[in-house]
Swiss-Prot record:
NCBIfam families: PRK13238.1. It catalyses: L-tryptophan + H2O = indole + pyruvate + NH4(+). Its EC number is 4.1.99.1. Keywords: Lyase, Pyridoxal phosphate, Tryptophan catabolism. Pathway: Amino-acid degradation; L-tryptophan degradation via pyruvate pathway; indole and pyruvate from L-tryptophan: step 1/1. Its cofactor is pyridoxal 5'-phosphate. It comes from Symbiobacterium thermophilum (strain DSM 24528 / JCM 14929 / IAM 14863 / T). The gene is tnaA2. The modification N6-(pyridoxal phosphate)lysine is found at K255. This is Tryptophanase 2. GO terms for molecular function: tryptophanase activity. Belongs to the beta-eliminating lyase family. It is an enzyme of class 4 (lyase).
């Protein structure tokens, strides 16, 4: 089997590692928040895999076909054809990115304040939009320790799901959201068996099941590799089965549609499409462009199919696993096995001297930038925010530092530099300090908050 990447590189972007004293000054000027750093001060950027990947020659050439008509553009119909072919959903709404899809959906599905939205685990923006719409997000993730092997750590705890529905009543639940892969749990996959059982429960109680499918192709790859009965199935066939169990989807296309901007909503039901479309039009744009240029729709249509290529998926997941193996062999505590898009360091174990409400995952992001110019992000109690009723910080089941790898961008030599940075920080971990707020926004606070070291 070939060991190289399944592509050649046609264009490059220079990067550099600025001196240590400049990194110290840059992160201080950014109020110890990596989101507020300038990209020119970052050596290797693992903040997110969202919109940071490299597009293919086929996507770039497709952009030349972009139809910029305000309504009924041919680019929309090419995108719709791709979405329907992969998902089986006939009713498709583009949005400017995933947040536009989330806002539009929850604005219609949460019909009164206090309704619950249940999930295997929400990501930050999804959780935020549930709350902004007046809903209450509830995580029902399968409980497995980070160091313990489980092939599908992203699974819904279906026993807890059904118990919650029975206790609170189906009429008080707006919908169920199945996140594939499960980003906040470490980019962990969800099994087809778990999706099927979640669908059965949703049907039993008459509750909508929506997929959050930013990384749907990676999830299909894990099913193919790890679940009995799927080894000989093509990723697109696995995707079609997966989507058959739901009522619709929300998507940030900036991940597994391999584009720099864009989002999607798609539904089986025309009535649901009409309701949600009523929010898309005033906030995103007309139904056939959703805030995007025609050229972006064209690139998305191509990328959705490219992401299901088995050679690409083997490379993609294999590169993440390569970094995970480098760290694990050095004794770094990580979520194991690694997920599809990122390595998640268990910051609570990496920095046991920092209490959870001083955000060890964020403290480690600061240290990794100072040590090697590597930008990462916290996925833990900082991202969880505050309880809207009590005002107290919500404690996450995980305190992660996420190293998200952009698609088709970095080589394994770059990842070796990342591993060296993490290992160096680990060797001086007792010197790493927690953080406290000096400015705390009320919603999605981690993006723009200011911090100081404790």
């Amino acid at each position: 089997m070939p060991k190289g990447e399944p592509f050649k590189i046609k264009m490059v972007e220079p990067i550099r590692l600025i001196p240590r004293e400049d990194r110290e000054a840059a992160i201080k000027a950014a109020h110890y928040n990596p989101f507020l750093l300038r990209s020119s001060d970052v050596y290797i950027d693992l903040l997110t895999d969202s919109g940071t990947g490299a597009m293919s020659q086929f996507q770039w050439s497709a952009m030349m076909l972009g139809d910029e008509s305000y309504a009924g553009a041919s680019s929309y119909y090419r995108l719709k054809e791709a979405v329907t072919d992969i998902t089986g959903y006939e009713y498709v709404l583009p949005t400017h990115q995933g947040r536009g899809a989330e806002k539009s959906a929850f604005a219609q599905l949460i019909t009164r304040p206090g309704m619950y939205v249940l999930s295997n685990m929400f990501f930050d923006t999804t959780r935020g939009h549930v709350q902004l719409a007046g809903g209450r997000p509830i995580d029902l993730l399968l409980d497995v320790p980070t160091e313990e092997y489980h092939p599908f750590k992203g699974n819904m705890d279906t026993a807890r799901l059904e118990a919650f529905i029975q206790e609170h009543g189906a009429e008080n639940i707006a919908c169920i959201v199945m996140t594939v892969t499960n980003n906040s749990a470490g980019g962990q996959p969800v099994s087809m068996a778990n999706i099927r059982e979640t669908s059965r429960i949703a049907r039993k109680y008459g509750i909508l099941l929506l997929f959050d499918v930013a990384r749907y192709a990676e999830n299909c790859h894990f099913i193919r590799m790890r679940e009995e009965g799927y080894a000989d199935k093509a990723p697109i066939d696995i995707a079609r089965e997966m989507f058959s169990y739901g009522d619709g989807l929300m998507m940030s296309a900036k991940k597994d549609a391999l584009v720099n901007i864009g989002g999607l909503l798609a539904f089986k039901d025309e009535e649901l499409y009409t309701r949600v479309g009523g929010t898309v039009v005033p906030f995103e744009g007309f139904l056939t462009y959703g805030g995007l240029a025609g050229r972006d729709l064209e690139a998305m249509a191509v990328g959705l199919r490219e992401a299901l290529d088995p050679d690409y998926l083997a490379y993609r997941v294999g590169q993440v696993e390569y970094l995970g193996n480098l760290l694990r062999s050095a004794g770094i505590p990580i979520q194991w096995p690694v997920g599809g898009h990122a390595v998640f360091i268990d910051a609570a174990k990496f920095l046991p001297h920092i209490p959870w409400d001083q955000f060890p995952g964020h403290a480690l992001t600061v240290a990794l930038y100072q040590e090697g110019g590597v930008r990462t992000v916290e996925v833990g109690s900082l991202v969880m925010g505050r309880d809207p009723e009590t005002g107290e910080n919500v404690r996450s089941p995980f305190e992660f530092t996420r190293l998200a790898i952009p698609r088709r961008v970095y080589t394994n030599l770059h990842l070796e530099d990342v591993a060296e940075t993490v290992i160096n920080a680990f060797q001086k971990r007792e010197q790493i300090r927690g953080v406290k707020f000096t400015r705390e926004p009320k919603v999605l606070r981690h993006f723009t908050a200011h911090f100081d070291l404790v």
